[in-house]
């Protein structure tokens, strides 16, 4: 299995026209309230698992996430009702298994054993405590954002210690950082 420091989790989002009226790259800088207008990640105290939430459906159209369609549900987020699709981080790993291999400089789909090993590490709380996601928003499109979540070992005294990998240097991308937090 690859070293987790060499893995990027790649989630490609396609949103409905509902997101056009919002600033899709807005984000708070507070780690505990990490939230952006088209998605969220927060601890689920009942299950002790993190939840990845994709928000942006207007209720008439299903979400398209990594080419797969999902029907949204109504849920209260940050005190207001939103149409959302949610997964645990472990589910997201299994549903969207596309990774970036730094040593070979290419995208690849890992084998089942690798996915199961990563899922076990999440179960056993051996996954890195902090997971950073980089939000890249293309200037030319209001419908699509690309998420790169990098699983890395972070210096506890410097949670901002990380590096970035631009997936397309030919386009003008806006770069924002979202902190994904894993419950220890």
Go through the PLM ranges and name each one.
Residues 7-107, 145, 150-155, 170-180:
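Extracellular adhesion/carbohydrate-recognition regions
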Residues 112-184:
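C-terminal, surface-exposed recognition/capping segments
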